[in-house]
Amino acid sequence: MFRNILVAIDGSRDADRALVHAIDLADCEHAKLTLLSAVPSPPAFAYATPGASALSDLDEKARQETEAIVRTARDRVPQSVSVTTVVKIEAAKPALLKQISEGDHDLVVMGSRGRGAVRSALLGSVSHHVLHHSDVPVLIVRGERDEGQQAEAAHAAG
């Protein structure tokens, strides 16, 4: 059913859970995995300001951390699953939507930020954005709720 699964990874617990589900799906379906992570780049004008070298150092550190996240995720994929990694230097929302449109993906798997319904509606999220703008099916994997989130959900339910 699925041939090429795109997985959004960012090092969060929710993304890690999404990766586990994507690996299981890819293994069962004999599908390829594409692991995508994005690191936003500061606007070009920021480099023309005082302190630009410190900003450049932070930008490089963010890139290295993102590449480490991708390597760690790739190492978790069994050899029986074909995997490709992509690191995009841009914000997560456009990076994911571009990869979806440019790649031959038939499923996107990503973690939820685990926000309550009201917070998600007010703040938005990458998963919400991709869910509503993707041309392919999107599987949102919810993370485990902590005690605060459970209390919030119970309060919202009345």
Segments (PLM) and residue ranges:
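Small/aliphatic-rich secondary-structure junction motif
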Residues: 3-52, 133, 146, 156-158
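Glycine-rich, Arg-bearing micro-motifs that act as flexible, cationic patches
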Residues: 107-132, 147-150
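Short, well-ordered secondary-structure micro-motifs
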Residues: 18, 45-48, 97-98, 121-122, ...
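A short acidic, glycine-rich active-site loop
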Residues: 53-68
